[in-house]
A protein has these predicted regions:
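Short hydrophobic alpha-helical runs that function as membrane-insertion/retention elements
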Residues: 23-26, 53-55, 74-76
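Short loop/edge segments at beta-strand edges and connector loops
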Residues: 49, 56, 103
Length: 133
């Protein structure tokens, strides 16, 4: 089960940082050692400081600060607790934060390999360029 915790964390982090964003992630309560080991690995790697920030703690205590913090622009919730999902969505509505609920994922499946997961934290903007004939 340890590899699934690490695989799940990497599968959640990779689309966010691939899109050029920073990430604040909450480690799984059951297996926090995977996240702490990954944080130490990222610290010694060439990833700039502050790109990935891993926290340990209780999700019930940290969900509200995640959802209401004004510098957090998107929230991706991995889980199936309907009360926590409702709390995250209502708290995030204060600053029009994008909330994506992913549920429990099977990290070895084809759905976890979808490259469009990058779009969950991206803003698409259109720029018009004038053109003369």
């Amino acid at each position: 089960m340890l590899f699934r915790s690490l695989l799940g964390l990497l599968s959640a982090l990779a689309p966010v940082i691939t899109g050029g964003n920073t990430c604040v992630a909450l480690a799984a309560r059951d297996y926090p050692l995977c996240a702490v080991s990954l944080a130490e690995t990222l610290h010694t790697a060439d990833l700039p400081a502050g790109v990935v920030n891993l926290l340990t703690g209780f999700r019930a205590e940290l969900l509200e600060p995640f959802a209401t913090h004004m510098d957090v622009n998107a929230l991706i919730y991995f889980g199936d607790d309907h009360a926590e999902i409702a709390q995250a969505e209502s708290s995030a509505a204060e600053n029009v934060k994008r909330v994506t609920v992913c549920g429990r994922a099977e990290w070895e499946g084809a759905a976890a390999l979808n490259p469009y997961a990058i779009l969950r934290t991206q803003e698409t903007k259109t720029t018009w360029h004038p053109f003369r004939f």
